[in-house]
From Swiss-Prot:
Gene3D superfamilies: lambda repressor-like DNA-binding domains. Pfam families: HTH_26 (PF13443). SUPFAM superfamilies: lambda repressor-like DNA-binding domains. Residues 42-100 form the HTH cro/C1-type domain. The keyword Transcription applies. It comes from the Bacteria. InterPro entries: Cro/C1-type_HTH, Lambda_DNA-bd_dom_sf. GO terms for molecular function: DNA binding. This is Uncharacterized HTH-type transcriptional regulator RC1195. Residues 53-72 bind DNA. Keywords: DNA-binding, Transcription, Transcription regulation.
Length: 109
Protein backbone atom coordinates (compact mmCIF):
# COMPACT_ATOMS: atom_id res chain seq x y z
CA UNK A 1 0.00 0.00 0.00
CA UNK A 2 1.29 3.44 -0.87
CA UNK A 3 2.15 5.85 1.92
CA UNK A 4 -0.08 8.46 0.31
CA UNK A 5 -3.10 6.18 0.75
CA UNK A 6 -2.46 5.62 4.45
CA UNK A 7 -2.90 9.29 5.24
CA UNK A 8 -4.69 11.28 2.60
CA UNK A 9 -5.87 14.66 3.90
CA UNK A 10 -6.98 15.53 0.37
CA UNK A 11 -10.15 13.51 0.91
CA UNK A 12 -11.42 15.98 3.50
CA UNK A 13 -12.66 19.45 2.62
CA UNK A 14 -10.65 22.42 3.86
CA UNK A 15 -7.28 20.66 3.93
CA UNK A 16 -5.89 22.02 0.66
CA UNK A 17 -2.77 23.59 2.19
CA UNK A 18 -2.04 20.51 4.28
CA UNK A 19 -2.55 18.30 1.23
CA UNK A 20 -0.11 20.35 -0.87
CA UNK A 21 2.46 20.39 1.94
CA UNK A 22 2.25 16.63 2.57
CA UNK A 23 2.41 15.88 -1.16
CA UNK A 24 5.59 17.96 -1.36
CA UNK A 25 7.14 16.19 1.65
CA UNK A 26 6.16 12.76 0.29
CA UNK A 27 7.70 13.47 -3.12
CA UNK A 28 10.86 14.85 -1.48
CA UNK A 29 11.29 11.64 0.53
CA UNK A 30 10.66 9.40 -2.49
CA UNK A 31 12.93 11.44 -4.78
CA UNK A 32 15.74 11.60 -2.26
CA UNK A 33 15.53 7.89 -1.63
CA UNK A 34 15.65 7.16 -5.37
CA UNK A 35 18.59 9.46 -6.06
CA UNK A 36 20.51 8.05 -3.10
CA UNK A 37 19.89 4.46 -4.20
CA UNK A 38 21.12 5.14 -7.74
CA UNK A 39 24.17 6.89 -6.30
CA UNK A 40 24.97 3.92 -4.02
CA UNK A 41 24.57 1.51 -6.95
CA UNK A 42 26.92 3.58 -9.12
CA UNK A 43 29.53 3.97 -6.39
CA UNK A 44 29.65 0.20 -6.01
CA UNK A 45 29.71 -0.58 -9.74
CA UNK A 46 32.24 2.10 -10.69
CA UNK A 47 34.60 0.72 -8.05
CA UNK A 48 34.04 -2.91 -9.12
CA UNK A 49 34.50 -2.17 -12.81
CA UNK A 50 37.36 0.27 -12.17
CA UNK A 51 35.84 2.95 -14.37
CA UNK A 52 35.26 6.64 -13.75
CA UNK A 53 32.28 8.94 -14.20
CA UNK A 54 33.55 10.36 -17.47
CA UNK A 55 33.88 6.93 -19.06
CA UNK A 56 30.41 5.91 -17.85
CA UNK A 57 28.95 9.09 -19.34
CA UNK A 58 30.64 8.43 -22.69
CA UNK A 59 29.64 4.78 -23.09
CA UNK A 60 26.06 5.24 -21.91
CA UNK A 61 25.45 8.54 -23.69
CA UNK A 62 24.36 10.07 -20.38
CA UNK A 63 25.56 13.66 -20.03
CA UNK A 64 28.52 13.92 -17.67
CA UNK A 65 26.66 16.59 -15.71
CA UNK A 66 23.84 14.11 -15.06
CA UNK A 67 26.27 11.46 -13.80
CA UNK A 68 27.89 14.05 -11.55
CA UNK A 69 24.53 15.17 -10.18
CA UNK A 70 23.63 11.57 -9.36
CA UNK A 71 26.93 11.15 -7.53
CA UNK A 72 26.15 14.27 -5.47
CA UNK A 73 22.63 13.03 -4.63
CA UNK A 74 22.72 13.88 -0.93
CA UNK A 75 24.07 17.38 -1.53
CA UNK A 76 21.61 18.10 -4.34
CA UNK A 77 18.15 17.34 -2.96
CA UNK A 78 16.32 18.71 -5.99
CA UNK A 79 17.78 16.22 -8.48
CA UNK A 80 16.08 12.97 -9.34
CA UNK A 81 17.41 10.80 -12.19
CA UNK A 82 15.01 10.22 -15.07
CA UNK A 83 13.77 6.74 -15.95
CA UNK A 84 15.72 6.87 -19.23
CA UNK A 85 18.95 7.52 -17.30
CA UNK A 86 18.28 4.61 -14.93
CA UNK A 87 17.54 2.37 -17.93
CA UNK A 88 20.84 3.31 -19.61
CA UNK A 89 22.72 2.55 -16.39
CA UNK A 90 20.96 -0.81 -16.09
CA UNK A 91 21.74 -1.71 -19.71
CA UNK A 92 25.41 -0.84 -19.34
CA UNK A 93 25.84 -2.92 -16.18
CA UNK A 94 23.66 -5.72 -17.60
CA UNK A 95 21.13 -5.64 -14.78
CA UNK A 96 17.53 -4.64 -14.17
CA UNK A 97 16.27 -1.20 -13.27
CA UNK A 98 15.08 -2.74 -9.99
CA UNK A 99 18.68 -3.61 -9.17
CA UNK A 100 19.83 -0.05 -9.92
CA UNK A 101 17.26 1.44 -7.55
CA UNK A 102 17.73 -1.42 -5.08
CA UNK A 103 14.04 -2.24 -5.21
CA UNK A 104 13.11 -5.60 -3.81
CA UNK A 105 10.78 -7.43 -6.17
CA UNK A 106 8.17 -9.60 -4.49
CA UNK A 107 7.61 -13.04 -5.90
CA UNK A 108 3.87 -13.71 -6.25
CA UNK A 109 4.19 -17.51 -6.37
Amino acid sequence: MKLSRLFDPCNKAGNTRLCIYLSFIYSEVINMALATKVKEFLEEKLKQEKIDRKYLAEVTNIPYTTVSRIMRAEANREFNPEIDTILKIAKYFNCTMDEVIKRKVQNNS
